[in-house]
Amino acid sequence: MEKIALFLPSLHGGGAERVMVNLARGFAERGLNVDLVLAKAEGPYLSQVPSNVRVVNLGVNRTLYSLLGLVRYLKQEQPKATLSALNHANIIAIWARLLSRVKTCLIVSEHNALSQSIENTTSVRAKLIPLLIKIFYPKADAVVAVSHGVAEDLIARTGLPSEKVKVIYNPVVAPEVFSKANEPLEHPWFQEGEPPVILGVGRLTTQKDFPTLVRAFVLVRKEHAARLMILGDGEDRPKLEALIRELGLEKDVAMPGFVDNPCKYMKRAALLVLSSRWEGFGNVLVEAMACGTPVISTDCPSGPAEILE
């Protein structure tokens, strides 16, 4: 049986991680032997990996430190194809294949607009990523971008030949989305007769710009009774909680944290709002629409404009 390997730093909550779990599940359902190779096997999506996918834990704390472990894995397992996601993991995957000399077909994927990611960080290492991409990405068999905007930005920023970069939208709507959407939800805000709930879903980071959503919610409440719920965790939680207190919204804004099944919230929400400053694709927009929920998004680069009118 042909083996496929998928390589990631971890399964901490993010769109790329969820997409890779979906891919692993889909490949396994089609009869392939699938390994999910993680620099460190941790994160909330770990519980969503199906039993017919083997998790390989390289057991290191940083993606860079996974290089030798990934080289050993490639030599031992000789996968027919290897897929990776997130640019720092992509670079390690390419480097590992070069060192291992294993003839695995290597496909790397970009899930965010590179320019936006670089401009919105102070990390010196992150500023080196475009140079490393120029050096390493041509050595991959293919580079996948999750939207045309991400592809165009990647080509413009790094000078990669356009024929090297292929656009493939994220596999978001798996059959289980619909069964998950119909699971019971006990939260009192979603009971009959309660005010409509506006939903935001994503990591609490600068990219997702939930402060803009909270401030917009203040304007909505001046016209209509409503509540706001934000699903997700991240480093900006303290700032967001402080803003909610400052605006006197404690009774009408809830942040339950990361949830295993956001679909059942989406199905019962009046509206899903994506307030991001930038996106690669916008998985939650597709998920919410699959659940039958109206969506609104900022016109940010890159993905939402390719999903919505």
Language-model-detected regions and their locations in the chain:
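Aromatic "clamp/platform" in nucleotide-sugar-dependent glycosyltransferases that forms part
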Residues: 258, 277
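Short hydrophobic beta-strand element within catalytic cores of glycosyltransferases
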Residues: 38, 294-298
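A conserved mid-protein helix/loop that constitutes part of the nucleotide-sugar donor-binding site
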Residues: 17-22, 196-219, 235-242
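Nucleotide-sugar donor phosphate/pyrophosphate-binding loop at the beta->alpha transition
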Residues: 64-68, 105, 115-136, 152, ...
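Acidic anion/phosphate-binding donor-loop and adjacent secondary structure
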Residues: 119, 152-193, 260, 264
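Short His-centered aromatic/hydrophobic patch
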Residues: 84-92, 110-112
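Short glycine/serine-rich donor-binding loops of glycosyltransferases
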Residues: 262, 282-285, 297, 304-307
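N-terminal strand-loop element at the rim of the active site
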Residues: 6-64, 158, 164-166, 235
